[in-house]
């Protein structure tokens, strides 16, 4: 994801959760989810291991999300549409939602479509509740929706690509 980890870790350490969350969400479209289920490969190569133990980056991200995400999300105002282009994103998994979020933040209309009734794909349908609470998924979905991303869920999987191309860029 290429996040600004040193910045948000420092802010969480100072108890500045709102500021830390703003840094996180600038690059990460699913902060509550990744704060819960990231497999934290970085811990095994952390330079802090030379001194004591690795920095618990995932836990710090989750702390910021739990303490600041609802407030941040409530204050979101969708970006002004600055493009006459309209994007259709096929697939409402985490990657599709991230794509839509960043397009929408940058002033383009974005519509996420999926044959399933609920977004987030594997996150929603495969990962069990004891690993990832539905509340964390809800937080990230609300973040995407509040930014102005539209959803068309439960679509017929036999739709016409040609018809789609006429309506979207």
List the predicted regions and their residue ranges.
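Short secondary-structure capping/turn micro-motifs that flank functional sites
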Residues: 28, 40, 119-120, 159-161
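Glycine-rich dinucleotide-binding loop and its adjacent helix/turn
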Residues: 63-81, 139-155, 161
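Ferredoxin-type iron-sulfur electron-transfer modules and their immediate structural context
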Residues: 1-86
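Short coil/turn segments at beta-strand junctions that form active-site/ligand-binding loops
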Residues: 85, 108, 169
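Core beta-strand elements of the Rossmann-like FAD/NAD(P) dinucleotide-binding domain
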Residues: 163-169
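Beta1-alpha1 glycine-rich phosphate/pyrophosphate-binding loop at the start
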Residues: 2-14, 19-24, 54-58, 90-158, ...
